[in-house]
Regions:
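ATP/NTP phosphate-donor binding region
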Residues: 4-229, 541-542
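C-terminal charged capping/lid subdomain of soluble metabolic enzymes
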Residues: 23, 33-121, 128-133, 314-317, ...
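Solvent-exposed alpha-helices and their adjacent loops that cap or buttress functional pockets
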Residues: 136, 163, 222-225, 248-250, ...
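Glycine-rich beta-strand-to-loop/alpha-helix junction loops that act as flexible
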Residues: 201-203, 233-235, 386-387
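A short, small-residue-rich loop immediately preceding and capping a beta-strand
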Residues: 222-260
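A glycine/threonine-rich phosphate-anchoring loop and its flanking beta-alpha core
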Residues: 244-340
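Active-site segments that bind and position negatively charged phosphate/pyrophosphate groups
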Residues: 334-450
Length: 542
């Protein structure tokens, strides 16, 4: 059986299709992918993954499997690799020969860096090798779970991840630590898992390269290894910065994202685009490094201020406008009650709880369908960038919360789409009305600075490989097209006309608690990462 697990082409697209056709659930497919590295795997983790298969294949025997896996995890050999135990058995010579052969045939099977990635490449050359060409590929796996009460002692989500490893190194948002720090400590203590906790303040003003450097130093001091995922517990800023630190540490260290905010829960958390701000620019530095698992637990939403909840909704609206009409309609029907009840986490209404879950699930599904099919941004047909074309240029200077800046970008994008004839005036107003009904910004005085907005457009064009490729609703709500040309003059004219349109909406299009300082955060326009870029003398040779 072990060899069958090892031989499976678990990272191929065909494997996904055949597994689905065979009736295997998502959790089972994920387990099979990791079991490619079965020989190098701690036996505690091995039997934990086999239990996940048993839940799908032999559910009547699940309890027996769970008890046995728990005994193995806590037993004397729970953290020993399977290959180590096999070499101690009666077939030592057989396994020595097998492992020697696998060093050449399938090195991932016995010496993997982690169970979550696989790579391959083909090299061709001419003559004696003075000209060489190669194609390289990497496959990475991830899981996403929307759940509740993950810190309840009865929950085994974190237990199954970290008990086989014997410890957990966790980066925790200081605000989360204040509200849930003791619960985190108690969970790991109850299950006998050593916890090393690194607590960081993670406000927008902290999102610079210095924070990433500090995280890297703490990882070194904690002795983080590439076979143990770091547990990141926090919101969007921590998802971005700690994710970037994991991408840089050992050039690739896995991490699990336990999302405690809306932005982290359905956008920054599962995103492969880790990043930090620098030189006054939003997300200037970054790397592509998706978490191996994202856990969105709306239990944490209860402690969030209304302003933090509100601005997170923008990332859901963006997916609804360009990807999911049904989600858009659900947001219209449910309205601000989502914010008031913390997405159903703080209400006795079964209907609102169910709606909150439906919204989160639909937003997550739409987001990852768009994101994971273009993991390294090798093209710019990216619907999830709606609202993010011009906003990176004015978010920090204006001191706005990210969601409000995105709201302005989405509203302006809907207006541009209308000018292109891609949507009707009714559809334009419907989009703007939804943004406004969630008290998000359609307008901000910073948009009067058309030169600043055009500069943002030029920078994003550089970032997008020479194309503007601004995603906008096209052909109706729930579908997407891309605007690739907009002159300085047309941009300025559109902004002026858009301002007049915004004045017809509540608050003249202004958002409620639109700025960081209004929701208890420092103003990034004052204390943010605005160190000027030192420009060396450049010699131009013609």
């Amino acid at each position: 059986m072990v060899e069958l697990l090892r031989q499976a082409d678990a990272f191929s697209e065909g494997f996904s299709h055949s597994s689905s056709a065979a009736g295997l659930g998502v959790e089972s497919v994920s387990a099979l992918r990791q079991l490619k590295t079965v020989y190098a795997m701690p036996v505690g983790k091995l039997f934990t993954l086999l239990t996940r298969l048993a839940a799908n294949l032999t559910p009547t025997e699940l309890l027996t499997w769970e008890r046995f896996a728990a005994d193995v995890r806590t037993g004397p050999n729970g953290q020993n690799a399977l290959k180590k135990l096999l070499l101690k058995g009666g077939k030592r010579e057989f396994y020595e020969q097998l492992f020697s052969r696998l060093e050449e045939e399938d090195p991932h099977a016995i010496y993997p860096t982690s169970s979550y990635r696989n790579s391959s490449g083909q090299v061709t050359y001419e003559g004696d090798g003075q000209r060489i060409e190669a194609v390289m590929s990497t496959s990475a796996m991830t899981e996403i779970l929307i759940t509740e009460d993950v810190l309840n002692f009865e929950s085994d989500v974190l237990l199954k991840l970290y008990q086989p490893l014997g410890r957990c190194v966790s980066v925790v948002d200081a605000n989360v630590e204040e509200h849930y720090g003791e619960e985190i400590n108690a969970y790991f203590a109850y299950h006998g898992i050593k916890l090393t906790k690194l607590v960081y303040r993670a406000m927008e003003v902290d999102k610079g390269i210095r924070m990433v450097e500090l995280l890297l130093g703490d990882f070194k001091n904690a002795g983080v290894s590439r076979e143990e995922p770091v547990l990141v517990v926090g919101g969007g800023v921590l998802a971005d910065t700690a994710g970037l630190a994991c991408a840089l540490y050992h050039r690739n260290t896995p991490y699990v994202m336990l999302a405690t905010s809306i932005v982290a829960g359905i956008d920054a958390g599962p995103s492969p685009r880790t990043c930090c701000d620098g030189h006054g620019y939003k997300n200037l530095f970054g790397a592509y490094h998706a978490p191996v698992m994202t856990i969105t637990d709306r239990t944490f939403f209860r402690s969030l201020r209304k302003g933090w909840m509100r601005h997170g909704v923008a990332e859901i609206i963006k997916m609804a406008v360009v990807k999911d009409l049904a989600l858009f309609e659900l947001l219209e029907e449910t309205g601000f009650a989502l914010v008031d009840t913390h997405f159903g986490a703080d209400t006795n209404s079964a209907d609102l709880k169910e709606r909150g879950n439906r919204v989160l699930s639909a937003a997550m599904r739409s987001y990852v369908e768009a994101e994971y099919g273009n993991l390294y941004e090798t093209h710019q047909c990216r619907p999830h960038a709606y609202g993010h074309t011009w906003s990176p240029g004015f978010e920090i200077p204006s001191g706005m919360l990210h969601g409000h800046a995105v709201g302005c970008g989405m509203g302006f994008g809907a207006y541009l789409s209308y000018l292109q004839g891609w949507i009707t005036a009714e559809e334009r107003d419907r989009i703007m009305r939804l943004i406004s009904n969630f008290e998000l910004s359609l307008w901000h005085p910073v948009l009067e600075e058309s030169d600043l907005i055009f500069e943002a457009q030029e920078r994003v064009t550089q970032k997008r490989g020479g194309n503007l490729a601004a995603p906008l609703p096209k052909g109706g709500i729930g579908t997407c097209g891309y605007l690739n040309e907009l002159t300085r003059e047309d941009l300025a004219s559109a902004l002026a006309d858009y301002q007049q349109l915004c004045e017809l909406f509540p608050r003249q299009g202004l958002g409620v608690e639109a700025h960081c300082h209004e929701v208890g955060l420092e103003n990034p326009s004052v204390t943010g990462h605005f160190e000027p870029i030192k420009k060396p003398a450049i010699a131009t040779v013609s």
